[in-house]
């Protein structure tokens, strides 16, 4: 009976180690988020940009100004990055809308996180597809 328990415990340990492998390798993909030398970590919250494939210049200009002023370590989008119905259920138009919003982030090599809102998939492009993009 003890041998069976030991074998089962070893098997569970092996499964646990294998299941943690993707997390370990994913951690190498992006730089670690960490506090700076002053113990600070700045997060810029961006909510409800609701942009379309023809980006609103004012929205992009405001985002760029805030990024430059705040110098964040992380940008968090709180949903409704795009106005789904305005993209016409088109993957291409959805990608253009996302490009417009994410370009200022990419230009500054900032890390970001996304929370989806109700408008993000109303255009017929799933949240899963948007995450892959």
Describe every region a protein language model picked out.
Residues 1-11:
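Bacterial N-terminal signal peptides that target proteins for export
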Residues 12-20:
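Hydrophobic core
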Residues 20-29:
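Sec-dependent signal peptide cleavage junction
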Residues 30-40, 101:
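Long, low-complexity, largely intrinsically disordered segments
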Residues 40-50:
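Active-site-proximal beta-strand elements of phosphoester/diester hydrolases
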Residues 51-55:
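Short, solvent-exposed loop/turn elements at domain surfaces
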Residues 57-133:
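Core catalytic region of metal-dependent phosphoesterases/phosphodiesterases
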